[in-house]
A protein has these predicted regions:
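Active-site segments that bind and position negatively charged phosphate/pyrophosphate groups
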Residues: 58-190
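A glycine/threonine-rich phosphate-anchoring loop and its flanking beta-alpha core
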Residues: 1-66
Length: 190
């Protein structure tokens, strides 16, 4: 993520937002619902590796999520109040990232899925879906992964054996096969 200055003002006409194409409303909702996962992952990162975490910001996002969740059925009826809650939630997510200096309050594994799909589509010259739609799908995949992880008992020896047997050349070949010309920049940051 790159730091950008916050805007001086935002103007959003909720009547216009409520009349937006339904796919755009769904994308906004998809991006907002992802915050359930991102806030949990942020807390886990704090507990496991000591990453910066702010409970006040996390609670700000949880409250925005509650309002979006409660208003979500109104999006189908194009209620301006529902569109307002989604817009406010997305704005608060941006503010939360600006306050913390990291994207964690608003972005987790689900966003990685979206970014990978975007890179792969760009590499192949294919169209991409709306960011919030992709993030919504990434949220469903993330939840499935989290559910699978609940059934795993950590095994230190197995992890150490995996590290010993890690084949960096095979991993690099896989990255190059999947990401083609984007692989060099990915490998440089790995």
């Amino acid at each position: 993520s790159l730091y950008n200055a916050c805007p001086q003002a935002l103007i959003a006409d909720t009547d216009i937002l409520a009349r937006a194409p339904m796919r755009l409303l769904q994308a906004g909702l998809g991006d907002m619902l992802a915050k359930y996962c991102s806030i949990c992952e942020w807390r886990i990162a704090h507990l496991v590796i000591g990453e910066y975490y702010c409970e006040d910001i996390a609670e700000l996002m949880r409250e925005a999520l509650r309002r979006v969740r409660d208003a979500a059925p109104g999006l189908a009826q194009r209620q301006p109040e529902a569109a307002e809650q989604v817009a406010q939630g997305l704005i608060l997510a941006g503010i939360a990232m600006a306050f913390t200096g990291v994207s964690r309050p608003a972005s987790g594994l689900e966003h990685y899925f979206s970014h990978i799909w975007e890179m792969m589509a760009l590499e192949r010259g294919l169209p991409v879906e709306l960011h919030g739609i992709q993030v919504g799908i990434g949220t469903l995949l993330s939840l499935r992964i989290w559910e699978d992880l609940r059934g795993i008992t950590p095994d230190r020896q197995r992890a150490l054996d995996f590290i010993k047997g890690f084949d960096e050349a095979a991993w690099e070949a896989m990255v190059r096969r999947i990401f083609a010309s984007a692989a060099d920049s990915i490998l440089q940051t790995a």
